A protein has these predicted regions:
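Active-site/ligand-binding neighborhood in enzyme catalytic cores
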Residues: 32-34, 41-110
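A conserved beta-strand/loop capping segment in the N-terminal third of enzymes
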Residues: 1-55
Length: 110
């Protein structure tokens, strides 16, 4: 059981003992494990960067491949927001599985 509401936690603990739970989602891309949501651990593993400024610079570099082009599909929209590496490794497969379509066939507004 998981809640951040102390009143609810106190209430349910009247009836049973619960273990502490920490939600730590990860993504598995070709056997490589990445933290989700994205954080400095994710960026360090992707690019070896150690500061937020370095991570931001890498993302900006990758975002710029589209130039001033207006995104025409979900893939282009995602790349324009988070760059190619994060999109390819952590977003594309999940999105295509969820929607049952290639990201290039999905509208940019999703």
């Amino acid at each position: 059981f998981h809640t951040s509401n102390k009143k609810i936690w106190d209430y349910v603990n009247q009836f049973a003992d619960f273990n502490r739970y920490t939600n730590s989602p990860v993504a598995n891309y070709n056997g490589e494990i990445y933290n989700l949501p994205f954080n400095m651990n994710t960026f360090n593993k992707l690019w070896g960067v150690v500061t937020p400024a370095e991570a931001q610079a890498k993302i900006e570099e990758q975002r710029s491949i589209l130039g001033d082009k207006r995104p025409e599909n979900l893939e282009e929209q995602a790349i324009s927001l988070i760059g190619t590496d994060i999109y390819e490794k952590l977003i594309k497969g999940y999105t295509e599985k969820q929607w049952g379509h290639k990201a290039t066939d999905l509208p940019a507004f999703i």
